[in-house]
């Protein structure tokens, strides 16, 4: 007989990456395979992510549900003895709204586990063979969003963050691209490279490399309003700087000669 996986005694929040099932972590894949109930954000996760689910598992879409409805289902299924997983696109710690769900579940004395996932900025950068941290250019990556209906802390305005001239990954910002471009051009040269990704790693997704001065125009032409990421970085296409890591004249713990 094959090995029978032990039922989880916790609810798992699982990051499933931006869309490609091959980018699932081994742990995420294992959790999906043993789940009795899979609660997933169908507006942000392609259905093929569920291809590895076991036969007979219950799959519940959440795009039309509010917080209380989602958590009520999770509690009900878990208390009925089911193995419950909650799927989130990308990595749950980034703009995932998991805190409020977890608080409700913990109030019911339910143990929680969070499984990290690959984020869209990593995949988009990989598609363009881009390194976002280059010595003497930038060693900092900022993951943020343009202010919209959800407020931003006063000290985290895009203008304040752009002053660092580091690599900036803009999530949830396609509707505010005009204002974002205007702000970024105050601190970055117009020719700064920008990776634009739409539904990154989905079957119909794509990425493009453009210049900052064209970010608004390009977004309008492509009718981008959601599921879009912008990576603005002075490091992209900058091949003039060399890392010390593999420099023969640089000594470190594992290479002292």
Language-model features: where?
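Class I SAM-dependent methyltransferase SAM-binding "motif I" and its flanking Rossmann-like core
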Residues: 20, 91-164, 208-211
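Short phosphate-engaging motifs
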Residues: 45, 120, 176
């Amino acid at each position: 007989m094959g090995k029978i996986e032990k039922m989880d005694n916790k609810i798992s929040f699982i990051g499933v990456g931006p869309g490609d099932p091959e980018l699932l972590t081994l742990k995420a894949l294992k959790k999906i395979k043993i789940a009795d109930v899979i609660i997933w954000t169908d507006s942000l996760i392609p259905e093929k992510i569920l291809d590895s689910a076991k036969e007979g598992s219950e799959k519940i879409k959440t795009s039309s549900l509010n917080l209380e409805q989602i958590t009520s289902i999770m509690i009900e299924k878990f208390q009925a003895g089911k193995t419950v997983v909650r799927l989130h696109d990308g990595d749950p710690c980034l703009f995932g709204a998991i805190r409020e769900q977890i608080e409700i579940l913990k109030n019911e004395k339910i143990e929680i586990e969070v499984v990290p996932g690959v984020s869209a900025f990593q995949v988009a950068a990989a598609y363009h063979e881009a390194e976002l941290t280059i010595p003497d250019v930038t060693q900092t990556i900022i993951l943020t969003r343009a202010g919209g209906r959800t407020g931003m802390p006063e000290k985290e305005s895009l203008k304040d963050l752009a002053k660092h001239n580091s690599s900036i990954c803009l999530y949830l910002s396609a509707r505010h691209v005009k204002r974002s471009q205007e702000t970024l051009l105050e601190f970055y040269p117009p020719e700064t490279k920008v990776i634009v990704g739409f539904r990154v790693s989905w079957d119909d997704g794509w990425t493009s490399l453009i210049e900052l001065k064209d970010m608004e125009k390009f977004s309008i032409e492509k009718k981008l309003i959601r599921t879009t990421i912008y990576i603005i970085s002075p490091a992209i296409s900058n091949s003039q700087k060399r890392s010390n890591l593999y420099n023969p004249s640089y000594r470190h713990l594992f290479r002292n000669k």
